[in-house]
Design a protein with these regions (language model features):
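Core segments of small alpha/beta cavity-forming domains
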Residues: 24-131
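Sec-dependent N-terminal signal peptides of Gram-positive bacterial secreted proteins and lipoproteins
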Residues: 3-23
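Intrinsically disordered, low-complexity segments enriched in glycine/proline and serine/threonine
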Residues: 5-6, 36-38, 64, 183, ...
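A broad structural signal for short, well-ordered beta-strand segments within beta-sheet-rich domains
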Residues: 126-137, 201-206
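Exposed beta-sheet edge and beta->alpha loop/turn motif
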Residues: 133-195
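Short, solvent-exposed aromatic-acidic interface loops
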Residues: 153-156, 202-208
């Protein structure tokens, strides 16, 4: 699997560097579009999911990790309080998140990291974790309702909110609290099957 992902990453890099004229069009994004895409990709960055490609079956581990973490971070109002240290994420909420962001319907099951019991995935409650977010670097249309590009993933201290800022702005705001670039990913997205105004993630390959 690792060798295959490395091969695909190299292939995608070659494609980016040698696209024939007209094969893809680089889009210049306005501020509102950029922030919308930053928010979309931040959902994957904060869930800390690893590389995957559409031509391989996306592991259930990836789907469940995304669904659990997405709900834990963004939908705490829908969590079930299990005990002082643990929350329960509903199975149907995990499946809904996967469909919304990947466009795939799944039947969520237990994984090595998260156990499903009585319709809930038990997970440790959040408490002072670092913030992860993404910013779009490159956005290209293939002309076939698919887009490819690159996002940068940053890590910042708990409570950091200037997720759409630039390094220059961060330095001015607080020189002691500048987000760290921790990863870069190449991606492919397509239109959502349920909402033409939304995207779903197809490929997600870390650049090493």
């Amino acid at each position: 699997m690792k060798k295959l992902l490395t091969f695909l990453l190299v292939s995608m890099l070659l494609v980016f560097c040698a696209l024939p004229a007209g094969a893809a069009t680089r889009w210049e994004l306005g501020a509102a579009e950029r922030e919308k895409l930053d928010t979309f990709f931040s959902n994957f960055a904060e869930a800390r999911i690893g590389s995957f490609v559409v031509n391989n079956e996306i592991p259930m581990e990836t789907f469940v990790q995304f669904g659990v973490q997405h709900n834990l971070i963004n939908r705490n109002y829908d969590l079930v309080n299990l005990d002082i240290n643990h929350s329960g994420v509903k199975k149907e909420a995990v499946e809904a998140a996967v469909y919304k962001y990947f466009g795939q319907r799944i039947n969520a099951v237990s994984t090595s990291q998260y156990k499903l019991e009585n319709g809930l995935f038990a997970v440790l409650k959040l408490g002072g974790e670092s913030v992860r977010f993404a910013q779009i670097e490159d956005w290209n249309s293939t002309g076939k309702d698919a887009w490819v590009g690159i996002v940068n993933v940053y890590s910042a201290s708990s409570g950091f909110t200037s997720v759409h800022g630039t390094p220059e702005e961060w330095k001015r705001e607080d020189p002691q609290d500048i987000p760290e670039l921790v990863a870069r990913f190449m991606f492919t997205v397509t239109r959502s099957p349920s909402d033409a105004d939304r995207y779903v993630l197809v490929d997600w390959l870390e650049m090493r």
